[in-house]
Amino acid sequence: MSFSVDVLANIAIELQRGIGHQDRFQRLITTLRQVLECDASALLRYDSRQFIPLAIDGLAKDVLGRRFALEGHPRLEAIARAGDVVRFPADSELPDPYDGLIPGQESLKVHACVGLPLFAGQNLIGALTLDGMQPDQFDVFSDEELRLIAALAAGALSNALLIEQLESQNMLPGDAAPFEALKETQMIGLSPGMTQLKKEIEIVAASDLNVLISGETGTGKELVAKAIHEASPRAVNPLVYLNCAALPESVAESELFGHVKGAFTGAISNRSGKFEMADNGTLFLDEIGELSLTLQAKLLRVLQYGDIQRVGDDRSLRVDVRVLAATNRDLREEVLAGRFRADLFHRLSVFPLLVPPLRERGDDVILLAGYFCEQCRLRLGLSRVVLSAGARNLLQHYSFPGNVRELEHAIHRAVVLSRATRSGDEVILEAQHFAFPEVTLPPPEAAAVPIVKQNLREATEEFQRKTIRQALAQNHHNWAASARMLETDVANLHRLAKRLGLKD
């Protein structure tokens, strides 16, 4: 089998039609899966010795949340080391990273696997993986044909990475690799709320504004602070963390501003505080709402004038620190109640960010579950940790009052329970491995009994209309691709569509 010019042109056209990088990547993967007739396809970005899924088709949704470290996935490591097409034989002893992750085939292992490393110049930027359940599924395609596919994918990915760098104004030093991927954070999610949050982080990171990060306990406020710091010009300097809720009043001032020798009993030497440690960098004050009013006043002075005084010292020290603060309280209500200074609130909330709770993030719960499953797999030395359909359904319908932190603990606990009832190094998490209270799953929809109101000819034509509409929708109204999917000649498809009233 060989690719026609039309096939390659169709792939290129789909890349151009996409609105935004994510849409283009998904169109590419979906089109490739149809053209190559594979069971699963994935586009991965390479970053810091791990592959990060950007778009998938035919794989469980939680794959998008997984981070595939090369050390734990020998096939992906082989692809990363190769400079060309990699074909894994059906009897390869190297485990496939997608075993158990093809919906409906969880108990079966992938038999055919092809990996295409993607390069920008000499730099590895990603990979394209093709998987099938039949041992010889990709034998009909030559290496040269697969190289053409890889070239198209590499071009799309390298352009996206370059645009991403330019848009973020986070250009790398001149001696760095021009297509080096941006730093990966653990802020996993594609929901509208998380997409908006990531955009806001990108905007505020380039500035030097103080940021107030609000959100319920367990939503990931510390990860937001880390993402802001790492995308900011201060990233080369330290990010210093301080949990205000864990500060006893007696040592809080010393922790923040430091002290000199002899300032109080036990002060046997000079000691720098968190502000000094964060000089030219960023200070993250977690649970800022727990600070006493006295300390709030001293913190306000630092934000206003940029100088600090160590406990027991009359001299002032200049510091250049960006402050990121986080709270799970409503600080406006705290101000009204007299428990938080209004002037400090306004100083901190120059650019407020709200981290959405997990219950408002839709399918993000499945992506995050995949991330934690992969973490458990690596930590416990397991060959695979996958979610059953029942487990995914349960996770999507639980409210998670403890948010992402509760999900993480639930996955770890479920893995331990599963291993206790099943031998071997393969773990399939079932719904019964999760102990969530008061989870009401929607009842399965009863199959409707059709009422026949048409004669055979009318019913046949209605079925044909529906089938053609679905094919066109799946192929973005590309008639040639739709004809291939329906295994008919494109001219015949046009004639049939005209007869059925689907086109003029």
UniProtKB/Swiss-Prot annotation:
Domain Sigma-54 factor interaction residues, every copy: 187-416
UniProt cross-references to SMART domains, sorted A to Z: AAA, GAF
Purpose: Required for the expression of anaerobic nitric oxide (NO) reductase, acts as a transcriptional activator for at least the norVW operon. Activation also requires sigma-54.
Pathway(s) of this molecule: Nitrogen metabolism; nitric oxide reduction
Gene Ontology molecular functions: ATP binding; ATP hydrolysis activity; DNA binding; DNA-binding transcription factor activity
Gene3D superfamilies: 1.10.8.60, 3.30.450.40, Homeodomain-like, P-loop containing nucleotide triphosphate hydrolases
Residues recorded with modification 4-aspartylphosphate: D57
Keywords linked to the UniProt accession: ATP-binding, DNA-binding, Nucleotide-binding, Phosphoprotein, Transcription, Transcription regulation
GO biological process: phosphorelay signal transduction system
Protein's name according to its UniProt entry: Anaerobic nitric oxide reductase transcription regulator NorR
Gene of this entry: norR
DNA bind region: 479-498
